[in-house]
Amino acid sequence: MALWRSSDNTVYLPPPSVAKVVNTDDYVTRTGIYYYAGSSRLLTVGHPYFKVPVNGGRKQEIPKVSAYQYRVFRVSLPDPNKFGLPDPSLYNPDTQRLVWACIGVEIGRGQPLGVGVSGHPLYNRLDDTENSHFSSAVSTQDSRDNVSVDYKQTQLCIIGCVPAMGEHWAKGKACKSTQQGDCPPLELVNTAIEDGDMIDTGYGAMDFRTLQETKSEVPLDICQSVCKYPDYLQMSADVYGDSMFFCLRKEQLFARHFWNRGGMVGDTIPSELYIKGTDIRERPGTHVYSPSPSGSMVSSDSQLFNKPYWLHKAQGHNNGICWHNQLFITVVDTTRSTNFTLSACTETAIPAVYSPTKFKEYTRHVEEYDLQFIFQLCTITLTADVMAYIHTMNPAILDNWNIGVTPPPSASLVDTYRYLQSAAIACQKDAPTPEKKDPYDDLKFWNVDLKEKFSTELDQFPLGRKFLLQVGARRRPTIGPRKRPASAKSSSSASKHKRKRVSK
């Protein structure tokens, strides 16, 4: 007897449809007009480890300037819709808008290569666990020492039209009450990378201020700071691709020394992991190990800077379009981390015999940058689909173009008084128009204004000449020897001579 039964195979339904994100090349039309823009020489000087107040804080303090900080340049571009164009008929302002596309960039770095060191005069170092002769028990005395290290070597460049995102581990909120001295819970935090934020130096991307209360586990410049690491996973998965058009990075690190930490051990070693010893080895020492990082040798053979880069295809959907007429350049370069040592005599005349009490020692760090760009002028036709897509992506773009979206009509009844100036009714003053707020007003960047530094004479600038060489454009000569036109007399005689030869 035949018996019918339903199939045991699992039926997979198609996933629900999602809104498709299109590439900027699908609605942005590129023109053949290119501009060069470059900054001036950008310099900064400060103390490499901490801020220094001057005269008890009455004057502006000496800033903290370290090679292990992020340099985030916010580059402001002119509005192309208000720009003096070489061809006024290039676009129709009634149906089109102009935008900039970044197609070339060169980040120049001055100063020689060098290795900088950082350290802590009271560094929490207990034993040398690499060449240890005996296992010491838990130390009850202050074993901190003056230690310096050379950090991890990093070169980094991230370019986008919004700030780059960073990640670090911070102190989280525990689900239940904990006792004083318990290990705090960890939480991964994502924040924008600002100018002056510390990079990962080899000790991890974490909030050292809240997670290391001894203030001696890491060197001075990061013991009360937050070290951030770029969140490449999130920026690569950015829906619109604004945070990272492309990135360049090189990292190098090895462990130079191996130590353990002083203090009471929070997590006891399980007894099944070792066999108890005798005498001084009856109780094992601390197992909280920590290496000292080192970035090793720096070389000009592995430099990312002082060379041009051309953007043909971005890694995301934004192929170099500078929304809101701005760019964010995030830079790290630890290969030029030399810290200057300065000395000043405390007396008017320099003594003939050296005495350390008559001299003051100082340390400073300097940085030098130069930014150059090649921009391409592009047009966007304001069709209904394009405007709806841009409004979904970022409504502020349409507001900056003076294009408003009409709100739907209100279904509720609106009260309208007749005598607006009458004292018998409440004040009918119109609400003030809210000012446009900068979305990055609370963030810190190094502002670079290029609104008056655009030029179409590409052959007059180093990066412009490199770009012309790439595209194969030949420059038309403006001066120099030219072929002299033949005189009328010689032309007439030549014609007669030619006719004479033909008559034969």
UniProtKB/Swiss-Prot annotation:
Its main location: virion. The keyword Disulfide bond applies. One of its GO terms (cellular component) is host cell nucleus. Pfam families: Late_protein_L1. Keywords: Capsid protein, Disulfide bond, Host nucleus, Host-virus interaction, Late protein, T=7 icosahedral capsid protein, Viral attachment to host cell, Viral penetration into host cytoplasm, Virion, Virus endocytosis by host, Virus entry into host cell. Residues 474-486, 495-504 have a biased composition (Basic residues). The keyword Protein biosynthesis does not apply. Residues 474-504 are annotated as: Disordered. One of its GO terms (biological process) is endocytosis involved in viral entry into host cell. GO terms for molecular function: structural molecule activity. It is found in: Virion; Host nucleus. It comes from the Viruses. Forms an icosahedral capsid with a T=7 symmetry and a 50 nm diameter. The capsid is composed of 72 pentamers linked to each other by disulfide bonds and associated with L2 proteins. Binds to heparan sulfate proteoglycans on cell surface of basal layer keratinocytes to provide initial virion attachment. This binding mediates a conformational change in the virus capsid that facilitates efficient infection. The virion enters the host cell via endocytosis. During virus trafficking, L1 protein dissociates from the viral DNA and the genomic DNA is released to the host nucleus. Self-assembles into homopentamers. The capsid has an icosahedral symmetry and consists of 72 capsomers, with each capsomer being a pentamer of L1. Interacts with the minor capsid protein L2; this interaction is necessary for viral genome encapsidation. Interacts with protein E2; this interaction enhances E2-dependent replication and transcription activation. This is Major capsid protein L1. It comes from Human papillomavirus type 70.
